[in-house]
């Protein structure tokens, strides 16, 4: 794994436990960090349990107001933000994309979708991800 990939994983591990109980991690990052998939995933995909998707204030606190953030999408069902924490790779600037969806809110609230809390991070079960 390249150094910039290790740095990306470290920043994701720093962010996830501080977002709180309202979010459930899904996708490639969940598979990489919590299920041992040997494949690099470079963004964070979350589902919101309550429907509150705007995490800018939490990110400002985590980044100690040093990160630049750019909202790319803000609708009733999706919130997407790019977090520039100073990372670069072979191609230049390398911001972190965080996307939150509220489309599965009712399924999460009614416990139809299975997830568990691992070290302070809600993560979908492997069956739900696959």
Language model features by range: what are they?
Residues 1-26, 30-130:
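Compositionally biased terminal segments of proteins
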């Amino acid at each position: 794994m390249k150094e910039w990939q290790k740095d990306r994983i470290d920043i994701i591990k720093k962010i996830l436990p501080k977002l709180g109980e309202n979010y459930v991690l899904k996708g490639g990052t969940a598979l990489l960090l919590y299920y041992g998939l040997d494949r690099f995933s470079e963004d964070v995909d979350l589902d919101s349990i309550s429907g509150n998707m705007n995490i800018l204030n939490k990110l400002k606190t985590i980044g100690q107001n040093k990160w630049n953030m750019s909202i790319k999408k803000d609708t009733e069902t999706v919130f997407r933000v790019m977090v520039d924490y100073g990372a670069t790779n072979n191609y230049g600037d390398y911001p972190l994309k965080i996307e939150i969806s509220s489309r599965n809110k009712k399924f999460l609230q009614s416990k139809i979708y299975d997830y568990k809390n691992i070290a302070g991070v809600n993560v979908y079960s492997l069956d739900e991800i696959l």
